[in-house]
Amino acid sequence: MLPLRVAYFVHDVTDPAVARRVRMLKAGGAEVSVLGFRRGDMALADIGGVSAVDLGRTYDARLAQRACKVIQRRSSLGEGQLVVRDADILLARSLEMLAIASAAKRNYAPKAALVYECLDVHRLMLSNSIPGRILRFLERSLMRKARLLIVSSPAFISQYFAPKQGVGTSWDQPVTIVENKMLQLDVADPNEGMRASDLAPGPPWRIGWFGMIRCRRSLDMLCRLAARVPGLIEVVIRGRPARVEFENFDAQVASAPGISFGGAYRPAELGALYGGVHFNWAIDYFEEGANSALLLPNRLYEGGPSGAVPIALARTETGRWLKRHGIGALFDSPADELRSFLEHLTPSAYRGLRQAIQAQPRGLFIADREDCETLVRALAIAGHEQSGARRNAQFAGIHTARSVNRV
């Protein structure tokens, strides 16, 4: 049987999560090509071990510039059209890439199945403003051509796609939830052996804030706590700061006692990073009440194998996920509650929090080869239905939007 050929349209090829998804698709048996924009200066020729077609540079927080790029690429994909013509699946990561992929389907690959992968719901999409209504109309129009919707959190369906975009009713195509789990294809992973138990359970409590750093309110809160109670916490920040969201990120970190920023990191360092902290900061007020309340972030899964205890808001989907599994430290108002919690936290109580995480099944945090095959099978069904063929018994495990499939 020929492998499923997937053309993957991405909004930022430099995002490590893109490389992880590419590896997942390859491990599931698909043949993958990547077409995408980049946030950095340098074009990347290789993403997750496959070739990449550079569509140009775009910028964070510059929606008008990105919209112009999308319009340009809807008209012409350049060398990307060679990749698209042979594809069975056009997989679009984000709304802007769905706009490009739908045009590519019309222009170059009318028989390919269009699949929409939505991993964030921008605050405008939830707004009743005129721009918000226009964007939702655009998304609905583009989704009519899609044969599968992939999301990373069930709240994206229950709080947005079902009530606002008709998923499960007027749009009744399959939905698959692919959580942002770590990907482990090998039997042994050296990172998995790193445990937070290597740290003495007591102050200074070391909090790790890793990944996309974009929450100004979190930084302010942690800096205030570190200054008011010297020796209570140390905060280790690593990753990619969205500097446009901060007044002066570097100066604020440099002036705060007990706060350090160590720059970007490689995925191979995750085990050591999370194994070197007591707590995993999973609070994000960026787009509060909107995307940050609905998503299940990468760091939720990345810290699990190392036993780092997540700190999260109880009212968010992250908090509900942690509560369902009986793990983590949940707060209604961390600005008021975190200090008292840490000051009264005993070594034995902390060990109990950590042991609850380490008692969880491996599959709660880590995706394996079987998960990869399940994802590619869902894509294959989308392609199968696009061709007009009937769904048969071998695809019985994939459900419609009314009964969401999980990977």
Task: Cite the ranges covered by each PLM segment.
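A charged, aromatic-enriched C-terminal amphipathic alpha-helix characteristic of glycosyltransferases
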Residues: 192, 333-340, 346-392, 400
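Nucleotide-activated donor-binding/catalytic signature segment of Leloir-type glycosyltransferases, i.e.
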Residues: 246-274
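Glycosyltransferase donor-sugar binding loop
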Residues: 210, 234-247, 263
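A short, active-site helix/loop in glycosyltransferases that binds the activated sugar's phosphate group
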Residues: 140-175, 182-187, 320, 375
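Membrane-proximal helix-turn-helix segments that form the acceptor-binding/catalytic region
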Residues: 77-84, 99, 107, 116, ...
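Nucleotide-sugar-dependent
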Residues: 16, 217, 264-301, 306, ...
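Conserved donor-binding/catalytic core segment of Leloir-type glycosyltransferases
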Residues: 7, 150, 195-217, 222-226
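N-terminal subdomain of nucleotide-sugar transferases
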Residues: 1-42, 85, 148, 165, ...
